[in-house]
Amino acid sequence: MSRLQFQLQATDGAARRGQLSFPCGTVQTPAFMPVGTYGAVKAVLPGQLCDLGAEIILGNTFHLFLRPGLEVIADHGGLHGFMRWNGPILTDSGGFQVFSLAHRRKISEQGVTFAAPTDGAQVFLGPEESMKIQKVLNSDVVMIFDECTPYPATEDVARDSMELSLRWAQRSRDAHDALDNDAALFGIIQGGVHPDLRGRSLDGLQAIGFDGYAIGGLAVGESESERNVILEYLHPRLPVDRPRYLMGVGRPEDLVESVARGVDMFDCVMPTRHARNGQYFTGFGTVKIRNACYARDVDPIEPGCGCPACVGGYTRAYLRHLDRCNEMLASMLGSLHNLWYYETLMANMRAAITAGTFFTFRHSFYLARGLDPPPLPEVASCAG
C-alpha cells in the first residue's frame, strides 16, 4: 500500500484544489516543487524552503546516483537525512537526464547505456536499476523509468518511444513492488505532441495502475499551444482521484494555464536559475536587474512582497551591484525572492479555486502584466 493519500477538495472549471498526505507531511495542491538536483536547492537552506512555503521538493536520481553515490546517501538513511529536509521528496527516474545526453547514450529494450558526464565511465540504467536507486534514496514519490520522446518527432518515432516507455512502465511497476517499496509510484504519459498517442499511453498506464500520473515530454521545445492541446485532451481522460504532475514546465504563465487545464503538481529549475542570471519574477512581470535603469533604483524587487529580500530592504540598485560583482549573495537573495513568488502564486491559485474565483484570478494575473488573457477552451470550464 502506498504511503500517499490524495484528496480532491474543490474544483473551479478544470482547476483542481487538493491535498497530498504522506507520513512526513502534507502538500497542498496545486503545488510547485523546488528542484534540488544534487541534493540541494541552489543557494537556499532547507529551513528557508519551509519559510518560503515549499512543502515538497524534487531530487535527481541520475545525478545523485553518479555523485555522491548510493553508499553515501544510504549512510544517512536516505535523501531526507542527507539533505536535512523533513518534508516529502519526489525523485525523478533519470530518464530525462539520459535523454539529454544525446550522442553519449545507446537505447535498447533493456535500458540505456551512457557515458557518465562525471568521468566518462560506461553506465547502464534501466527500469529495475532506477527503482533500486530510488528505493535507497527513500523518496516519497518515485517516478517510473521512461524514454522522453524527442521534439520534434514523427508520429512513428513518437509511437515507438511511447510503446517502449509502456513496456518500461510495467517493468518499473514490477520492480517497485518486488522491492516492497511503499513510496507512491507515478506513471509518465508520453506520446509527443500527438493526442492519440498520449491517450494510448494513458490507457496503458492505467491498465498497469499507478498512484499518480505525470505528463512527460512537454518541456523539450514544443510550443505553448501544442502543450495546451495535450493538456486539454488528457484532462477529461485522467482519473479524478489521482494527482496529475506536469514535469519540468515552469514559467508563471505556464503554471496558471496548466492549472486551468487540471494540473496539480509542477517542478522547474527556473526560479533559482533565473535568479542566478539576474532575473526576478514579480506580479507585473520580470525584473531584469542587469538593465542600467536599476543602477540607482532604491525600491525592493517588488514593493509589498513578503520575501526575505524585499522585507529586508535590499534594493534593486544593491542587487544589481552584487550581480555585477558576481557576489553569491545576489543569487541567494534572488532565489529567495523567486521561490517566494512561485509559492505565493500557487497559494493564491489554491485560494481562488476554493473560493470559486480562479478565472477572475487568472484574468487579474494577466492584466497586472499589461496583457490580455489568452482564450480558454471549453474543456477548462469542465470540472474533473
Curated annotation (Swiss-Prot):
Binds 1 zinc ion per subunit. Homodimer. Within each dimer, one monomer is responsible for RNA recognition and catalysis, while the other monomer binds to the replacement base PreQ1. The active site is at 92 (proton acceptor), 267 (nucleophile). Catalyzes the base-exchange of a guanine (G) residue with the queuine precursor 7-aminomethyl-7-deazaguanine (PreQ1) at position 34 (anticodon wobble position) in tRNAs with GU(N) anticodons (tRNA-Asp, -Asn, -His and -Tyr). Catalysis occurs through a double-displacement mechanism. The nucleophile active site attacks the C1' of nucleotide 34 to detach the guanine base from the RNA, forming a covalent enzyme-RNA intermediate. The proton acceptor active site deprotonates the incoming PreQ1, allowing a nucleophilic attack on the C1' of the ribose to form the product. It comes from the Bacteria. This is Queuine tRNA-ribosyltransferase. One of its GO terms (biological process) is tRNA wobble guanine modification. Pathway: tRNA modification; tRNA-queuosine biosynthesis. Belongs to the queuine tRNA-ribosyltransferase family. InterPro entries: ArchSynthase1/Queuine_TRR, TGT, TGT-like_sf, tRNA_ribo_trans-like. GO terms for cellular component: cytosol. The keyword Cell cycle does not apply. Keywords: Glycosyltransferase, Metal-binding, Queuosine biosynthesis, Transferase, tRNA processing, Zinc. It catalyses: 7-aminomethyl-7-carbaguanine + guanosine(34) in tRNA = 7-aminomethyl-7-carbaguanosine(34) in tRNA + guanine. It holds the Pfam family TGT. Its cofactor is Zn(2+). Residues 248-254, 272-276 are annotated as: RNA binding. GO terms for molecular function: metal ion binding; tRNA-guanosine(34) queuine transglycosylase activity. NCBIfam families: Q_tRNA_tgt, tgt_general. Zn(2+) binds at residues 305, 307, 310, 337. Substrate binds at residues 92-96, 146, 190, 217. Its EC number is 2.4.2.29. Coiled coil: none annotated.
